[in-house]
C-alpha cells in the first residue's frame, strides 16, 4: 500500500531508503534551502523517483539561506575538511533543518491522505546533528501523531545503523551510488576530502562496493 511520503535529498541514504521502501512510497519531496550542494543532489532525487514511477516535488526554502547561519550555506570554500564526526564539521549544521523539513512534510502527507513520512537519518549523524538523534525522531513522531487528524507517523528506519550498513542494503538492492550526490562543496565533481566525501568513501569500501564516484582529490 502506497501510504508514505519520503524526504529525498539525492544522497546515498535517502536514495537507498527510496528503493528500500519503493512499494510504500506515493510521493518524494526534496527541499531546496540554498545549500552549496542542493543543485547537485536534487536532480538525482528527481531522476530516481521518475525511474520508480513516484511523483516528486521540490519545495523552496529560501528563508533558510537568508536567515540561518551554517557553512553549508556560505560557499564551497567554507566547508571544512576532515572526518564527518570531527568537531569542525559542526559548522555544517543548518539549525533545526530536519525539524523544519519534517514539519512541512507531515503537513503535505496529511493533505494527501498519507500516513507516514520517511526520513533517512542514520547512526553516523548523531555526533553532529541533534535533529538526527533517536530522541528527536521519537519526539517529532509523537508530535506528528498528536498534531494531525490522521495520526501521521515519522518513520526513520536507519536511525540506529551506520552508513556502511545502509550501503550494504543498497548493494543488495543493486543501487548505483555513482548516481547519488554527497559532497557538501557542490562543485562539478565530489571534492573528496570534506566530511561527507570521506564518510561516503569509507562506507562504500567497507560494504565492498566499487566506488565509481569521480573525486577531485
Predicted segments, located by residue:
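Short Cys/His-rich "knuckle" micro-motifs
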Residues: 204-207
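Poly-acidic low-complexity segments
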Residues: 60-63, 176, 190, 211
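Short cysteine/histidine-rich metal-coordination sites, predominantly Zn2+-binding motifs
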Residues: 186-187, 209-217
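Local cysteine-cluster metal-coordination motifs and their immediate loop/turn environment
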Residues: 103, 179-202
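ATP-dependent adenylation/nucleotidyltransferase module used to activate substrates
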Residues: 1-174
Amino acid at each position: 500500500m502506497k501510504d508514505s511520503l519520503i524526504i529525498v535529498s539525492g544522497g546515498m541514504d535517502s536514495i537507498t531508503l527510496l528503493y528500500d521502501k519503493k512499494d510504500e512510497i506515493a510521493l518524494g519531496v526534496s527541499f531546496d534551502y540554498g545549500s552549496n550542494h542542493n543543485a547537485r543532489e536534487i536532480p538525482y532525487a528527481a531522476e530516481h523517483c521518475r525511474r520508480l514511477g513516484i511523483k516528486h516535488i521540490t519545495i523552496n526554502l529560501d528563508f533558510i539561506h537568508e536567515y540561518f547561519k551554517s557553512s553549508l550555506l556560505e560557499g564551497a570554500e567554507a566547508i571544512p575538511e576532515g572526518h564527518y564526526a570531527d568537531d569542525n564539521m559542526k559548522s555544517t549544521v543548518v539549525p533545526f533543518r530536519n525539524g523544519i523539513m519534517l514539519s512541512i512534510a507531515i503537513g503535505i502527507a496529511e493533505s494527501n491522505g498519507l500516513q507516514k513520512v520517511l526520513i533517512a537519518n542514520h547512526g553516523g549523524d548523531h555526533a553532529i546533528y541533534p535533529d538526527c538523534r533517536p530522541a528527536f525522531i521519537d519526539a517529532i513522531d509523537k508530535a506528528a501523531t498528536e498534531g494531525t487528524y490522521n495520526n501521521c507517523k515519522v518513520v526513520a528506519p536507519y536511525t540506529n545503523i551506520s552508513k556502511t550498513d545502509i550501503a550494504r542494503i543498497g548493494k543488495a538492492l543493486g543501487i548505483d551510488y555513482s548516481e547519488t550526490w554527497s559532497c557538501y562543496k557542490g562543485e562539478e565533481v565530489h571534492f573528496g576530502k570534506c566530511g561527507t566525501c570521506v564518510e561516503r568513501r569509507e562506507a562504500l569500501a567497507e560494504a565492498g562496493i566499487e566506488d565509481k564516484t569521480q573525486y577531485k582529490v
